[in-house]
Amino acid sequence: MTGLDRERIVDGAPALSAEELQAALAGLPGWQLAGDGKSICREWRFKNFKQAAQLANLAAWQAEAAGHHPDIAFGWGHARVSYSTHSAGGVSRNDLIMAARLDAATG
């Protein structure tokens, strides 16, 4: 998935097939298909609330800049980000791009 974080978000991106999604997730360590089968998610653990809030804010700022918004949950010592393309009814390449951007920003 080299360079995925630099790809453009495209309106109307279709949902990926199960095979495409599994292949793509292999290049995004830590990301997995959620139980609903229609979103990808990743969880982080931190030493305090501040770090969890910083990750949540980073994901939110990236989402606003791209116009593609995840579900974000966080609390003391943990954060979870989930991406799905609701208009496509599942995971699109846009979700993978946003996951890669978040990974690139968090190192």
From Swiss-Prot:
Cystine crosslinks: none
EC number: 4.2.1.96
Family matches, as Pfam families: Pterin_4a
An example Gene Ontology biological process: tetrahydrobiopterin biosynthetic process
InterPro entries in the cross-refs: PCD_sf (IPR036428), Pterin_deHydtase (IPR001533)
GO molecular function: 4-alpha-hydroxytetrahydrobiopterin dehydratase activity
Catalytic activity: (4aS,6R)-4a-hydroxy-L-erythro-5,6,7,8-tetrahydrobiopterin = (6R)-L-erythro-6,7-dihydrobiopterin + H2O
EC top class named in words: lyase
Keywords: Lyase
The family this protein is said to belong to: Belongs to the pterin-4-alpha-carbinolamine dehydratase family.
HAMAP family, A to Z: Pterin_4_alpha
Name this protein carries in UniProt: Putative pterin-4-alpha-carbinolamine dehydratase
